[in-house]
Amino acid sequence: MTAHTFDAGCKNWILFLIIVIACCGATLVFAQNRPAQVNTSERLYRVSDLDSLGGTNSRGNSINNRAWISGYSNLAGNQRRHAALWRNGILFDLGTLGGPNSSVTWNVKNERGLIVGIAQTALPQPLGEAWSSAAFYPGPLNTGFVNLGFVWENGLTRALPTLGGDNGFATGCNNAGHVVGWTENTFHDPECVAPQVLQFRPVVWEVGRNEIVTNELPLIAGDTSGAATAINNHGQVVGISGICDQAVGRHTAKHAVLWQNGSVTDIGDLGAPFWNTPTAINERGDVVGFAGTPGDPDGNILHAFIWTKDGGIRPLGELPGHVYSEASGINERRQVVGLSCDADFVDCRAYLWENGVMRDLNDLKAPGYPARLDNAKDINDKGEITGRSTDPNTGMRKAFFATPVGVSAH
């Protein structure tokens, strides 16, 4: 593990990822139920870049209430990528499991100090599977190695066991040390979409000091594969259920699901039986994610959604002129962050959705930060946001940290 100081202050590949409490009792109002209201004042955000591990592409994917940010950074030369943790002014390189690459790709969230993600081992893929790893890693070594979920705590990285198969993936973790993700079992499923060979199932790992217990989660009746993507401190888990296709995409995401008390529930879709992928869940059980478009099984156009127990599933919409959106993070105030893109994926922008209104986060920046915020990945209960920005002059992509700083009058 290497520490670095920092200053205080993908069209198809995107589709794999991903690769989100009402205030004072107020009722959540959706955009389609009332027109957007323009405030005479609005919150501004002071944005700062986070340091990198030497490469020109980094991203914050998770931020907890202690302002610990985890994600990834390319190494010098941009041929390799490592999971990264930005904590209290220090950038930590979390290393790998013996292979060239690793990443924290989802919003981990817990306050306990556990970081989870995916890492390559030194072992070659025995069945020639891709495990979608080219979606998570750069360069010529992005495939060909066995991938496992990992958990990091206090400088120690541990591999998470599988259900007997070769590969695994960890996405989220709560304060009890319950880690969610998915792993392969031993069944060679003839219905798997090549190059996938083995079925994979959603799991919860109970991480103890001396042992890790793996618990498989049930699928929707008739489904064969699935993945768990996020967990809250009440033990509610969200994820996907479908067939042995791309995790976490396409027909593996036939159903967006919620697990609680040992049961699985289909939370619905926006009209398509594919790409229905929850990405985050808050303590109230509100869920955000993205869903497929009817007639588009390749996932060229996705739509951000929010699901609540009382309101069901609703689309969040897109920014003006855009057709594509994802929701990646949600806090207890039901503030949602994500990205919105035009049809050509040339203009992608981070957004903040609140009380039924989606705002371009770039319009809420305090003066002095020139880079474009192109993807917001997570938001904590203080309203602090992390994601990725792009410098318009150099093209460098950097992880950012956005902090609410006050109100600007208009």
Positions of PLM-derived features:
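Residue-level hotspots at or immediately adjacent to binding/recognition sites across diverse folds
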Residues: 2-410
